[in-house]
Amino acid sequence: HHLLFHGNTIHGAERRRETDGTPTRGRPEPLTYYYFGGPISEVTAAARAAVAGKLDNVAVVGLGAGSLACHRQEGETWTFFEIDPEVVRLARDPAMFRFLSSCAPAAPIVLGDARLTLAASPQQFDLIVLDAFSSDAIPTHLLTREALRGYLAHLSSHGMLLVHISNRHL
């Protein structure tokens, strides 16, 4: 397995070998909180239903290992907003994690503070996933009224905002 840690929190895990020791093949499967069939699958299904089956544009604030990319379907554009260039380097390196290279190889990654970079985007999104953490804490500047107004201003008419709030303090 390859694991991405920040502080004391796992932010992504990928199985790299089968139980018999052979390398895994095909599309990687997220193993942590974004596992297939979990709550994120329910949210993306509801968001797709709200827009007649396909999400044109999805914004993900926080890249981590890139495991959310494997919830993307053909024809959907998922844009990742990430503040840490080292996280981008790790997620893009298929020797470390294959989520991006296998599931969304052309996905745009916007480097910088998502409050500012998302606000500067001309796009409307059918789904915005706020999944930014510093170790196990949510950066509070991403949860201010001003920041939330900015996210809501970039939602399409049927868009949804998903805020991942699980942490050791809530």
Which residue ranges define each predicted feature?
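Local beta-strand N-terminus motif with an aromatic residue
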Residues: 55, 124-126, 158
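Receiver (REC) domain switch-region micro-motif
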Residues: 58, 128, 161
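Short conserved AdoMet
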Residues: 73, 122, 155-156
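A short acidic, Gly/Pro-enriched loop at the edge of an enzyme's catalytic core
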Residues: 119-129
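Conserved NAD(P)H cofactor-binding loop of Rossmann-fold oxidoreductase domains
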Residues: 132-133
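A short glycine-rich, Lys/Arg-flanked "PGG" loop and its adjoining helix->strand segment in the class I
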Residues: 143-158
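Conserved beta-strand signature within the Rossmann-like core of class I S-adenosyl-L-methionine
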Residues: 158-165
